[in-house]
Amino acid sequence: MTTMIGQTRQAGSSSYEQAWQAEQAPCPGMEPDTLTVGVVVVTRNPTFFQTGLSVLNDIRDYVFNRVHIQSELPLKLSELASDPLYSEAREKAIHFLKNQSKALNIQVIQCASLAEATGKIIYTHALEQQPEFQMGMLFYDQTSLGNVDDSIEKIDRDLDAFYSAMQRGGIPAFYTTFSTVTFIRDVRSSFRYLPQQYREIVRSEDPAIFQTELLCLWMDFFEMNYTNRRVKPIGALALHNTLAEQLIQFFERTAASRWLVSYYTGSIISNLIGYLDRHAEAHGALVLRGPNEHAIACGAMANWQLYRMPFLGVVTSGMMDEFKGTLINLKETAAQGIIVAAENRNNQWYSFQGTQTPTEDMRDVLAAKRIPYVYIDDVDGIADGLAEVFRLYHQAQGPVVILATQNVLESTLSLEPVPGDLPPVSGLPAYDCPPISDSFEQAMALINEGPEKLVWQLGPVSDDEYALVHEIADAAGLALVDSLAHPGSAPKYYQGKRNPHYLGTLAIYGYSPRVYNFLHTNDKLNPMSDQSVFMIKSRVAQITTPFSDGRLERKVHLVQLTHDERHLSPYADLKLHMDCLTFLRAVKANLHVDAALREKRKALIAAYLDSPSDVVSQLPSLPMSANYFFCQLNRVIENLIKTENFDFTGVYDVGRCGISAVRNVAKTRRGFSGWYGRALMGDALLATSYLAHTSPTHVVAFIGDGAKGIVPDILPAFIDNILTHPQLLNKSITIFYFCNGGLSVINTYQERILFNRTSRQMRLVNVDQPAFEQTVDDFHIQGKTLTHFDEDTIRHALMTPKRLNLFSVVLGHNNEGDGISLATAKGWQRDPSDREALQERKDWAARQPESTSTSFDQGQNKEAIS
């Protein structure tokens, strides 16, 4: 050990100070710099500090004009290890330093904590009035502070506080990823991610490696900060971004409440995203991330359908296609949002990732899909371009795409807010005085005087609309059904109580046996004079019923309500081109249902069995059947609803088990279905990580192994959102992954409809997932495989807040039940629906009090128990 060259004095009982001044410029032609760059070393380890001093001392003759050191540890030099790699790095460093024009003044400050360093720098700066001092590099030795390393998020927060204190104190700082490094004990396990405020390195026990790392870190800082004229010591000052600022202002003005921001980054959009990350939430945005661009569309669609939350999505060049068919789903659901996509200039020749070339043009694709877009390729055109974007946005026909070039995306031009408020619209009919058309009068005649069986299938009704529907159903004796595309639009439980009007699900797949029996007698559709089906907020798309075109045209009396004239169906016997809320208020105002008719209708609803209608749903075979698992799960969930006021938002992916969940598991509110629109496997799974943060209730997702395998793992992005928004997760999020090793719906089509054997095309390979548990802050994540129905585990998982449950449920395949086709409605396991049995149940229903909310099977069970 040798004493460092220069004058050394002990400044106090526990501190040391030393200054060294070069007698001449370190290298010919170098001029002394008037600035002093601070180097802060936070450590309690003498070896760490002294090795760092020795490395600086080893190159002092080639860069330093003056060195001033203040420390709590003794000022000694360690003998550096002889190592060829270190020697090579030193030679390259000296060669680089000799070519610099200025010699550097540095002030080394060693402290035992970050807080002490903050105080010392601010105090010294104020006391000595060093206007030319700039905070340079920070070495943060976690290995000498406490017994374990702090979490990444805590270190990020502490460092952000340090640099913010520098800024408040008027101390310039080089604040880049090269200016701050933290040394930790070992590579982080469980989950890892890139820190935002620093570089992270494991402290090597090998002296040669450690000293080489210190030299490389210093030289990286020197090259990328001090010698780079583009990098200024301005601290954490955020750069301006024109486009991001204008979009934030627009959504703040126009969004009713929260609005959603989501992005998948790229080089030329990173400045825009950085501005959104820093400023959007202060103006009402919720910034969430997904694992890819496709997830942005899925999260936007789910949050628009359920909560009418507008969105802003940002993607880089060439990524418009990554939205897949979900982009069309966004248009079909008329989701209001803006998508910013990077694009090349027209005069670029086959730009990297560009989609405007001599052989393709993304604008033609968007036009073919009838998705409006605005191409902005000049900074001077930002205001006019955004004005057109905002005009298109207010047409409420789906998302609007901004195709913007790099100069536009990175512009820092100051602009006045571009006008974008909703223009006044005149001539809209008042809700309390709707025009009474012949079609409306015919619809009211059906409601007031019509058949005893009146079924309303609800589309994407809002909470206010459903409240009116429920009131009308009670006054008129209506039967309510939901659909595969909009599960829970008519819930089985409403405001914590059993919904007496709810009949089940009517859809192309997954129709309930209770709905089938209600509409059929002896497996034949009831006469059109005996029943009518109202489709509310519906296009009468193929997914809404199991009936063929011929049956819809000749066998089903259909009343359709839609606000969009383009959606009026050729199969509707009565077409109502009206706004839904206007229609419902008009119906309520014109209700005159005879009490006897109302009670007959209610008695009929109660007379039909509420049952899975198959034997295997009660049979605990191994592997479990989907029928059995969902029957047991429904039993648990209904019990929780009744006893614990359990409320949840269901998420249903495309596949047999998504169908089973819609059909068999009780719902308390509207959920999100991947079956909507293009029916894309994986949409629901990707939407789950967004709904976890926006849903006001617990979230339960039903995902097949096919859907799981077709999209990325959502867990990493989920954890990223936990770190950013932990306050939004005081709920349980449960994802059931159903693993039966095959594409079941296709299997059933082959085996039950075409009478073929299954084949390789339907095979899926399930790889066993080991159980795990992980805690992120105070949020718990668990993964577990279920081969049996574990009621205690599931019940606890569903009710425990601040928890993500990932259950892999092992199931077998069968073709039984679940309304996969009308053929399955006639199997030997079905409950009897003959006239005598039905008459018995109708007689029972007629004897019940008017306020009853039980169905026949529940009443029979009570009588048997008594």
UniProtKB/Swiss-Prot annotation:
Q: What is its EC number?
A: 2.2.1.12
Q: Where in the sequence does UniProt note compositional bias of the Basic and acidic residues kind? A: 828-845
GO molecular function terms noted in the UniProt entry: thiamine pyrophosphate binding; transketolase or transaldolase activity
| Cofactor(s) the record lists | thiamine diphosphate
> Deletion: any effect?
Cells lacking this gene show a white phenotype and produce 4-hydroxy-2,2'-bipyrrole-5-carbaldehyde (HBC), 4- methoxy-2,2'-bipyrrole-5-carbaldehyde (MBC) and 4-hydroxy-2,2'-bipyrrole-5-methanol (HBM).
- Return the similarity comment: Belongs to the TPP enzyme family.
Q: What does this protein do?
A: Involved in the biosynthesis of 2-methyl-3-n-amyl-pyrrole (MAP), one of the terminal products involved in the biosynthesis of the red antibiotic prodigiosin (Pig). Catalyzes the decarboxylation of pyruvate, followed by the modification of the resulting two-carbon fragment acetaldehyde at the C3 position of the 2-octenal (1,2-addition of acetaldehyde) giving 3-acetyloctanal.
Q: What is this protein called?
A: Thiamine diphosphate dependent-3-acetyloctanal synthase PigD
Q: Which organism is it from?
A: Serratia sp. (strain ATCC 39006) (Prodigiosinella confusarubida)
Source organism phylogeny: Bacteria, Pseudomonadati, Pseudomonadota, Gammaproteobacteria, Enterobacterales
Instruction: State which gene encodes it.
Output: pigD
